[in-house]
Amino acid sequence: MIQFVIPSYQRVGAVSALDMFPTDYEPHIVVREHEEKAYNDAYGSRAKIITIPDGVNGIAGTRKAITDMYAGQRIWMIDDDTTIRMSSMRKRDDRRCVDKVNQLTHEQFYELIQYVEDAMDCGYYHGHARLPIFKITSSWGNYRENSYGFTNTWYDLGKLTTEQIGYGKIDLCEDMYAFLNLINQGYPHLALFKYLVVSGKAQAPGGCSSIRSNSKHNRALEQINREFPEQARWKTSNIEKRKSLGEEDEPLKVLRMCVSRKEKSEAFHKFNAIHPIAVD
């Protein structure tokens, strides 16, 4: 069964991701050694607390450590302020909406697990449930291949290695790097719309916010653009509205993903035969 893994740093009292799990499922929270007692006291009855050395560097280093520790397993890494919910189509404007009120029921949670297990069996060794920032219409279907997203990612670590994923090769925006890195090795990515996520406020205290600034973020994006220039392209319009990340030491840059989705993978055809892409 898929193991949910929640990396967390300086967020004792704010791990809202735990709200999505039924009582008979044990998620793991990965923390620095010096925070083990505080997290155990707060969440030890609801999750297993896993430690990594205090010297592990940032979220990219944390994710690399997680992919090392869980080698051979199927995992779903999810931000500590993120929960996965059901979605439904709103007919009046043909918009897919996330259920912001109700968590998954016991049955729905295990249906989600099976849905993604099926995706992995079909060849989707990495994927995510979408954060609905932009409008998702019925024409998008229940999922889309090679569409980028963040806040959560699943990996079949029986099929992918830490080196293949590429965490630790870039300090920030590591999810974007891993997404492109795996696609360019021939591993398609699956973005779910049937299930959407509710996530916490950007730049909340702790976590990545403790190390992120505009300049650090921009240097990471520049590295991604150098390595994947055709798929990670600079966005030049409507970027002035982007909020600053920590210190406003320079204007924030933005990349847009340009990954071809015209030719579907073998994994897509296998998964579509089991779970049709079309909205009911």
Curated annotation (Swiss-Prot):
Molecular function, one GO term: glycosyltransferase activity
Record keywords, A-Z: Glycosyltransferase, Transferase
Pathway membership, UniProt: Genetic information processing; DNA modification
Entry annotated with the keyword Glycosyltransferase: yes
Pfam family, one: TAGT
Source organism, top-level taxon: Viruses
Keyword hit for Repeat: no
EC top class named in words: transferase
Biological-process GO terms, alphabetical: DNA modification
Enzyme Commission number(s) from the entry: 2.4.1.-
Function of the protein: Transfers a gentiobiosyl-group on a hydroxymethylcytosine residue in DNA. Is involved in a DNA modification process to protects the phage genome against its own nucleases and the host restriction endonuclease system.
Protein name: Beta-glucosyl-HMC-alpha-glucosyl-transferase
